[in-house]
Amino acid sequence: MKKVIKKIALAYSGGLDTSIMIPWLKEHYEHAEVIAVICDLGQQEDLDAIKNKALKSGASKAYVVDVKNEFAIQYLWPLVKSGALYEDQYILGTISRPLIAQKLVEIALTEEVNAVAHGATGKGNDQVRFEYSIKALAPQLEIIAPWRTWDIKSRQEAIVYAKAHGIEVPVTPKAPYSRDHNIWYISHEGGVLEDPSQEMPDDVLLMTAPVSQTPDEEEVVVLDFKKGVPVALNGQELSPVDLLNSLNQKAGQHGIGVADIVENRLVGMKIRGIYEAPAAAVLYKAHKLLESLCLTRSTLHLKQSLQQTYANLVYEGRWFSQTKQALDAFIDVTQQHVTGCVKLKLFKGNIIPAGMHSPYSLHHPELATFEEDNVYNQKDAEGFINLFSLSAKIYSQVHQGGNYD
């Protein structure tokens, strides 16, 4: 017997798609009650207006959940500690999806709903990220993905459906780009950006100044870290949200943190995206510099070898996985002594190191100096070299003439 769905929690953004999903869900699930869940991730939108729109569209309730601080502490700071970049470029702003799914599930369980729904399309990665997280957190909940089942195939059809159901559709030109925004980044896709042979127009950028319009004087910023986590900017301890907002403003005006990428989507296609993440770029640079000072060679190299694995699991939405828990445990150990201060200069899109120090620095000038010293006996190197190169020497002797094929 088919399960009767009487109440549905919907991850709601306020856009056209999720707005028409409210009446569509009520029609296709025997007038089920729909509860809208809106997450405040720092996207700088009028969330009260979005809540009212959800209610006007037919939702019985609409929750607005401020998750900015939780987003920074439980998601972004672990990402900074990991140093992970998807395909060595993408700053992973869609790390927000598991958090949205988590809040959707929490409210779903509180409201005792039968099912949850999301507005991700059948072509993108987000459907995987949302549904993986939901299944990991609450496998008993049914998941509804209208884009994979309904008959609406275009924006024009969606507008017609909205008007037929009394949903207000603003009379404005269609945005030239599809955007996603949170406190960590802004992404831009679609329009002219779909052609990788075309240069990115300056009008794409919202958070970052084009390099041609940046100040002609550098700006110095100083970041303090404690166990791999940023805790202060320019000597002032700030909340995670305030630190990100301030650093986004400072780095953004210097044209820092723009990535023009053709990425491999999880679902198989390649897509071009423009990503703005000024604060993220600076934090990653500062953290990487501090790690170079505080981690041993073998620890640093092992951590670097795992960064793509971590990036992949974040990109794929596998936040609530055993693999991620295991990697976090390793990373947390590596970060125990990543504490210190990093000075950087921001100038014309560049992040320039300007000094760093740490009470746990493994750099000792008396060992590294090129001047005369009484600490390092250079004769000791001979025995090490003999042992280190022994296998190469034996191979050459056996195969005569050093033929390495």
Swiss-Prot record:
L-citrulline binds at Y90, N125, R129, S178, S187, E263, Y275. GO terms for cellular component: cytoplasm. Coiled coil: none annotated. It is an enzyme of class 6 (ligase). Its EC number is 6.3.4.5. It catalyses: L-citrulline + L-aspartate + ATP = 2-(N(omega)-L-arginino)succinate + AMP + diphosphate + H(+). L-aspartate binds at T121, N125, D126. ATP binds at A11, Y12, S13, G14, G15, L16, D17, T18, S19, G119. Keywords: Amino-acid biosynthesis, Arginine biosynthesis, ATP-binding, Cytoplasm, Ligase, Nucleotide-binding. GO terms for biological process: argininosuccinate metabolic process; L-arginine biosynthetic process; urea cycle. SUPFAM superfamilies: Adenine nucleotide alpha hydrolases-like, Argininosuccinate synthetase, C-terminal domain. InterPro entries: Arginosuc_syn_C, Arginosuc_syn_N, Arginosuc_synth, Arginosuc_synth_CS, Arginosuc_synth_type_1_subfam, AS_cat/multimer_dom_body, Rossmann-like_a/b/a_fold. Gene3D superfamilies: Argininosuccinate synthetase, chain A, domain 2, HUPs, Single helix bin. Pathway: Amino-acid biosynthesis; L-arginine biosynthesis; L-arginine from L-ornithine and carbamoyl phosphate: step 2/3. Pfam families: Arginosuc_syn_C, Arginosuc_synth. One of its GO terms (molecular function) is ATP binding. It is found in: Cytoplasm. Homotetramer. Belongs to the argininosuccinate synthase family. Type 1 subfamily. This is Argininosuccinate synthase. It comes from Legionella pneumophila (strain Paris).
